[in-house]
């Protein structure tokens, strides 16, 4: 234990002097080790006493994207204890994997196939680590370093991670200096505390520091996973830097939380045992890719931050993290809501036979060991990457999901619709409708315009006027009457009825459509027209002459009406009347107005004194007639005098 009494900064300097990871800094991006920087500088001018120092993790990238300088002296005693031979470091094609086995497994190298298989099984090209394997250090720009504390605890890091240091629960001060933090473009270092635990911070995810009783971690789009015996990173993208500080140095701006992050305090979760071969970490809470933070009590905080990882923090008091900001008040408890984070609602467990972890996990809860008074206010949700979980049991989510109903109307809705239609039909039947008459086929009354059908001068129900052959309703369709039976067009044309069909009296063609019968003859409706004006006479009064030519009433009177002998105009019936009034005298026809005395204009009729006395074909009254004769009037007319009788 004497070597742990030494200044941690000096121990770190001794370790880094002999590490082959220095090869990374030969590309000119980092300066050479400076022997003058072997001692730890004070941060912000504050002093620290030996045994009570906390070294802050310096992020590789600043907020503006520049790379920070990296000191090269860090934790040599731990390196000498874990890596006695510098030749056991990994090459560029290998990835450092955390170690839980004895010294015989520590010198094992992992092949490129194993590394690639694990990288893509975790959802990231670099972040895959398997617990229970030998820790190796990779060179160039994909370096990872894992160091152990004296009690044999290890922490896995991501190839794109940086350094974070955590110490015992009594550490209260932090210092930043070129020698107190180490960063590389894609490297990670783990600094052991005073026999407690280790922490690793990603250079592209967050800046985190663990202090006295509270460990705080933040990442723009990550959440933190850590455990006493190891941790595993998940994959997620990051887009910024979030700073975490001790609560005594906190500012009001650092306690804000991300609207898209959720929190779960897992301090009541016991630090269960682990299986080195299956790499089952039963107490590791896992946060979702959208930044869930879980915290769990432990003797010291082990922190793993991956640039594309989900992170869970186990601290002695509490852990806070959010996307882009965090809360540093340990007394502020933020329990995770049950239905929160829809993307984390379904988590399943499937692990490949070789120990590599897939992207699914399952929810686990653990019994409460301490602080039972806060049991009701928080929900403990643990995440297990492995198939064998010895310390947990599966449980249902704290809310029930209502099963989705099948698409389409339900049985009750269909039944309601059927009842509604039936009721509408009944109402329509019983509703009082207009009465049209009696159906000539069934003898029942016809109610409603929709039920009335008129054809061939008769009234039918719509359902009664059907084809005799196929039973189709013929309302509004062409039909054929054959010997008192009606047929539809299809049955009439293709059933041999053409031989018995009637022919039009006008054109002589077979009547295939509607038939019009008049004067004992059959006509096409289009052929039954006036021979003078050619207007259709279907449903219009008409008349015929002796030759059976068809005339409308107007044209018939124009052609066949008698002409007045006085005005020589046809004598037509009065407007609105069908009767013709005329006066017949001397076998001539006269209008009533034209029948008057030609000399004096006296209206002539059958009355006494108005009678007509024609003379030489002229209409004369009795006085005018004598005047023309120039003869004296006899008291009695001679017997040979003709008497004219007017006919009306």
Curated annotation (Swiss-Prot):
Subcellular location: Cell junction, Adherens junction; Nucleus
Record keywords, A-Z: Cell junction, LIM domain, Metal-binding, Nucleus, Repeat, Repressor, Transcription, Transcription regulation, Zinc
GO cellular component, as recorded: adherens junction; ciliary basal body; nucleus; P-body; transcription regulator complex
Chain residue ranges for the region called Disordered: 27-56, 142-291, 306-327
Compositionally biased tracts (Low complexity): 158-171, 178-192, 252-267
UniProt-listed Pfam families: LIM (PF00412)
Main location per the UniProt record: other
A molecular-function term among this protein's GO annotations: transcription corepressor activity
SUPFAM superfamilies: Glucocorticoid receptor-like (DNA-binding domain)
Domain of life per record: Eukaryota
Compositionally biased region (Polar residues): 197-213, 220-241
UniProt domain LIM zinc-binding: residue ranges: 437-498, 502-561, 562-631
GO annotation, biological process: cilium assembly; cloaca development; cytoskeleton organization; determination of heart left/right asymmetry; determination of left/right asymmetry in lateral mesoderm; establishment of mitotic spindle orientation; heart looping; negative regulation of hippo signaling
InterPro entries: Ajuba-like, Ajuba-like_LIM1, Ajuba-like_LIM2, Ajuba-like_LIM3, Znf_LIM
Family under the similarity heading: Belongs to the zyxin/ajuba family.
Main function: May monitor slit diaphragm protein assembly, a specialized adherens junction characteristic of podocytes. In case of podocyte injury, it shuttles into the nucleus and acts as a transcription regulator. Plays a role in the regulation of cell morphology and cytoskeletal organization. Acts as a transcriptional corepressor for snai1 and snai2/slug and plays a role in regulating neural crest development.
PANTHER family reported for this sequence: LIM DOMAIN-CONTAINING PROTEIN JUB (PTHR24219), WILMS TUMOR PROTEIN 1-INTERACTING PROTEIN (PTHR24219:SF6)
Name of this chain's protein: Wilms tumor protein 1-interacting protein homolog
Species of provenance: Danio rerio
Gene from which this protein is expressed: wtip
